[in-house]
Amino acid sequence: MEKAEAAAVVIPLSVSNPSYRGSGMSDQEVSEEQSAGDAWVSAAMAAAEAVAAAATSTGIDNTNDYTYTAASENGD
């Protein structure tokens, strides 16, 4: 049985790291791309803060403090 060869995957530097785009992009295009990336990060952080605020307002505490006391559970 012949051994199958895996296809080579080439990721251009312009995809994996936009700072390597070279002279093909104008400063305006680079600036717009960076602004779009910054806007995406800001939106994601705002959404995370909104979720955290909603969880706090509904009484969900996410401090990872899972102290268990049997007496308090049993009303003793």
Curated annotation (Swiss-Prot):
Record membrane topology: Single-pass type II membrane protein
Keywords attached to this entry: Host cell membrane, Host endoplasmic reticulum, Host Golgi apparatus, Host membrane, Membrane, Viral envelope protein, Virion
Protein localization: Virion membrane; Host Golgi apparatus membrane; Host smooth endoplasmic reticulum membrane; Host cell membrane
Domain of life: Viruses
Gene Ontology CC annotations of this record: host cell Golgi membrane; host cell plasma membrane; host cell smooth endoplasmic reticulum membrane; membrane; viral envelope; virion membrane
Coarse class of the protein's main subcellular location: virion
Function: Essential for the anterograde spread of the infection throughout the host nervous system. Together with the gE/gI heterodimer, US9 is involved in the sorting and transport of viral structural components toward axon tips.
Family per record: Belongs to the alphaherpesvirinae envelope protein US9 family.
Protein name: Envelope protein US9 homolog
Organism: Equine herpesvirus 1 (strain AB1)
